[in-house]
């Protein structure tokens, strides 16, 4: 047994949890959105109420992961509804399962890990509801090192890590041109070209969704984190096969609280490019959001049972 996929509704119980502990394999619980595919696509909620608790929350008690919307209702020739996998999502789910299985056999020294942290602009501290983010992140990196992950160049202390983050992994205000110029000289950012960005966007975003990005932010690279030759800078701190990245602002404006906790506008190119670089440029095997929260869970529309972008 390499993985378990459960398409039922609710918990399987403590006996199943004991079984999972013995076999030590990932347990997936893909979602049935319980309505016509078109209605689910147009619904801003995705899933709520009893279906949310029974399809997402209770399976997670058993250890289920990846609540991926996979099944929907369709109308047959007899005008009766039937359940089937959504064709454009089935391949993604299968690839996800195979990726998890592959990680079990890949040496830790070869695994590539991306860790996002939330941080305010400039010299603001990394935040997570009172948690000591810097020391906690450093302890995680030490544990990864002990487990055989490649963290070459990791500083000797948490203070050294924080200095590296302030130098290479900062978040800038829109008008902090002097700080940005210094960052470009000394911060060792990843640079995303228009060709790469366009290629990654085509793989990831639906054309109509990307047009919302362009309408809100202009054409790539936009006005923020852009270089004179038309590239987009991605702040990152890399130690071997582990990269730390700040979560960029999910919108524009001076109200940082509103930008983080809810904006209806499409995110800027910087926000999208960072995640696309992590996936396609850095080729991360694992992505972690470290801390209590950032802006990801406050982005517009569906929060669970997400549709394709």
What are these regions (language model features)?
Residues 1-309:
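An N-terminal assembly and electron-transfer interface module characteristic of large anaerobic redox
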């Amino acid at each position: 047994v390499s993985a378990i996929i459960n398409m039922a509704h609710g918990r399987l119980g403590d006996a199943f949890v004991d079984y999972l502990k013995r076999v030590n394999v990932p347990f997936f619980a893909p979602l049935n959105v319980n309505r016509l595919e078109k209605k689910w696509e147009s619904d801003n909620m995705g899933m709520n109420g009893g279906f949310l608790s029974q399809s997402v929350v209770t399976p997670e008690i058993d250890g289920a992961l990846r609540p991926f919307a996979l099944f929907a209702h369709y109308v047959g020739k007899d005008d009766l509804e039937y359940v089937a996998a959504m064709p454009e999502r089935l391949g993604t789910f299968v690839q996800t399962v195979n990726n998890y299985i592959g990680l079990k056999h890949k040496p830790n020294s070869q695994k590539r890990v991306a860790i996002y942290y939330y941080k305010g602009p400039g010299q603001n501290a990394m935040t997570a509801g009172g948690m000591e983010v810097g020391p906690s992140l450093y302890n995680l990196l030490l544990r990864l090192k002990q487990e055989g992950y490649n963290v070459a160049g990791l500083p000797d202390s948490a203070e050294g890590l924080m200095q590296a983050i302030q130098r290479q992994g900062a978040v800038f205000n829109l008008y902090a041109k002097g700080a940005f110029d210094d960052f470009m000289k000394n911060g060792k950012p990843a640079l995303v070209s228009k060709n790469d960005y366009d290629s990654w966007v085509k793989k990831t975003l639906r054309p109509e969704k990307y047009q919302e990005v362009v309408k809100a932010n202009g054409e790539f690279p936009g006005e923020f984190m852009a270089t004179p030759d038309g590239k987009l800078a991605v702040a990152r701190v890399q130690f071997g096969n582990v990269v730390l990245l700040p979560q960029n602002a999910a919108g524009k404006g001076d109200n940082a609280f509103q930008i983080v906790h809810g904006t209806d506008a499409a995110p800027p190119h910087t926000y999208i490019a960072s995640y696309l670089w992590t996936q396609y440029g850095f080729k991360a095997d694992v992505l972690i959001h470290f801390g209590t929260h950032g802006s990801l869970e406050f982005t517009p529309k569906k929060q669970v049972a997400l549709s394709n972008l």
